[in-house]
From Swiss-Prot:
Keywords, sorted A to Z: Antiport, Hydrogen ion transport, Ion transport, Membrane, Transmembrane, Transmembrane helix, Transport
Residues on Extracellular side: 96-111, 163-170, 222-227, 329-342, 408-412, 469-477
Annotated protein name in UniProt: Probable drug/proton antiporter YHK8
PANTHER family: DRUG_PROTON ANTIPORTER YHK8-RELATED, MAJOR FACILITATOR SUPERFAMILY
Regions that span the bilayer: 75-95, 112-132, 142-162, 171-191, 201-221, 228-248, 308-328, 343-363, 387-407, 413-433, 448-468, 478-498
Subcellular location: Membrane
Swiss-Prot/TrEMBL induction comment: Up-regulated in cells exhibiting reduced susceptibility to azoles.
Residues on Cytoplasmic side: 1-74, 133-141, 192-200, 249-307, 364-386, 434-447, 499-514
Biological role: Probable drug/proton antiporter.
UniProt membrane topology term: Multi-pass membrane protein
Length: 514
């Protein structure tokens, strides 16, 4: 299930074309070149030929067919690790912020912008970087985006003004977001559909684990200069960039077809061979592609009530996690006198909850297939809500446990257990919402996911701005109770959508109607 929504999110685009009748060239040389004529078009009165890959004979450009399983997993592992580093940077600000406040003589509220602006960048960046990958390929997008992210990380580290630091945080998140929006498609490029479940599940989980690991880096280096936390992640990002430069090839099929078309034009001395992406580039500018990629997600958000509710739901879950990045240091230092490293390790509970929940995606997929079979082979998007049924209850349960076990006379492991249950619930909520979004919106799945990412990151960036003040003014227990009650209000969502989903989809201008 996790694999399916990620594949659809990464690969749905305006560049997809329908298959047409295959033709072949009647010559031995053409057979060796493995030319597949899948469509014909008229250009200046001459017949032109669109090239594609033949399933029977491997083209040299069709690199996915030549890759060993080990190399596929190496590429997906490197992309996954880089994605995790990008998300670690978002929360690594948590503990060094104390030193940043002292160094720049700023308030806690201003310091919190270091988290907020980075997460804003993660939410806004995909709207601009995804079209870049669809026109120019995965590899060049990764290289330029990670290089620019590293450059802006340098500004964050060595800027002499807090304005420069914040500007660097936003732009490093903006460009780093390519590994959250494009990476899933790159992994889908090199694995067959029946093999992609495990690598995609690992990739998806890593994006959630990164924020939990970030504070651990900050805690380990807390007694050093605040810069060393970010220098460590800068060096790690640089190592990832070097490895990507030398070991990650282009995987985007439309780009590989351009290479094949160029080879055929050169070898056959015939300029009539073309790839669809070449035509798309001629007819679509990068600016127009960016405009379309930003217009449709906002249309979905404003005109579709289902999308608005689902975006708010996932945004709320992620926002609470990021609120904890300012709340945990206050709670565990005040109640249990935790030091920096102990505070950093307190986030492991959320991480453990997500890790334990990840394998269930295979079980939910089996359950989905059973439901389809039971329904005479007819599947509906609402069948994807099963993980959300569990997540809807686990998230408030975890928050209630955390809220009412935060006492000095209660062992610190109790609220950590509550955070683990909450983390598990968050994973189920995201799995159910993402799978439903892809299945219900189909043609507009990529726009739906972009819309969800934008709302999610905006909410996650806003909540830390008032989190500490809320815990100080309301008290640890009542602030936690308030968060739990907000998630309780969301419990009916999957049940109402399961009952009325078909009716709501029929009224939606974007959703798939039965």
């Amino acid at each position: 299930m996790v694999a399916e929504f990620q594949i659809a999110s990464a690969q749905s685009s305006a560049l997809t074309s329908t298959e047409e009748e295959h033709c072949s060239i009647n010559s031995d040389k053409a057979a060796k070149l493995d030319l597949e004529l899948t469509s014909e078009r008229k250009n200046d009165g001459k017949q032109s030929h669109e090239v594609t890959f033949n399933e029977d004979i491997a083209d040299p450009e069709d690199i996915a067919r030549h890759m060993s399983t080990a190399r596929r997993y190496y590429i997906s592992s490197l992309i996954t690790f880089t994605s995790m580093v990008i998300t670690m940077i978002s929360s690594s600000w948590t503990l060094p912020s104390t030193h940043i406040i002292e160094h720049f003589h700023i308030s806690h509220e201003v310091s919190t912008l270091g988290i907020t602006l980075y997460v804003f960048g993660l939410g806004i960046g995909p709207l601009f970087l995804s079209p870049l990958s669809e026109l120019y390929g995965r590899r060049i997008t990764f290289l330029y985006a990670l290089t620019l992210s590293i450059i802006w990380q340098c500004l964050t580290i060595w800027s002499k003004t807090i304005t420069g630091v914040m500007f660097g945080r936003f732009l490093s998140g903006f460009f780093g977001s390519a590994f959250l929006s494009v990476a899933g498609g790159a992994i889908a490029d090199i694995f067959d559909k029946d093999q992609i479940g495990i690598p995609m599940a690992i990739y998806t989980t890593s994006a959630f684990l990164g924020p939990s690991l970030g504070p651990i880096i900050g805690g380990a280096l807390y007694h050093q200069s605040y810069k060393w936390t970010f220098i460590t992640l800068l060096i790690t990002s640089g190592c990832c960039l070097v490895m990507i430069i030398f070991t990650i090839p282009e995987t985007y099929k439309p780009m590989l077809l351009i290479r094949k078309a160029k080879r055929l034009r050169k070898e056959k001395n015939d300029q009539r061979y073309y790839a669809v992406l070449e035509v798309t580039r001629e007819q679509t500018s990068l600016l127009s592609a960016i405009f379309l990629s930003t217009k449709r997600p906002f249309g979905l958000l404003l005109r579709d009530r289902m999308m608005g509710v689902l975006c708010f739901y996932t945004g709320l879950e992620l926002a609470i996690i990021y609120l904890y990045f300012v709340a945990f240091p206050y709670v565990f230092k005040k109640l249990y006198n935790f030091g920096p490293m102990e505070i950093a390790c307190s986030y492991i509970g959320i991480m453990v909850g997500m890790i334990l929940s990840a394998p269930t995606c295979l079980l939910f997929q089996k359950t989905f297939e059973w439901r389809v079979k039971r329904n005479n082979g007819v599947k509906t998007p609402e069948m994807r809500f099963e993980p959300l049924f569990y997540g809807a209850f686990l998230t408030p349960v975890g928050l209630f446990i955390f809220a009412f076990t935060c006492y000095k006379h209660v062992h610190w492991i109790a609220p950590i257990i509550g955070s683990a249950i909450f983390g598990s619930g968050v994973y189920f909520v995201f799995t159910g919402v993402f799978a439903y979004t892809v299945d219900a919106y189909r043609r507009y799945a990529a726009s739906g996911m972009a819309c969800n990412t934008f709302v999610r990151c905006i909410m996650a960036g806003v909540f830390p701005l008032f989190g500490l003040q809320m815990y100080k003014s309301m008290g640890v227990n009542w602030a936690g109770f308030l968060l739990a009650m907000v998630t309780v209000a969301m419990i009916p969502v999957p049940f109402l959508f399961t009952k009325y989903g078909a009716r709501l989809r029929a009224k939606s201008p974007y959703a798939w109607d039965d």
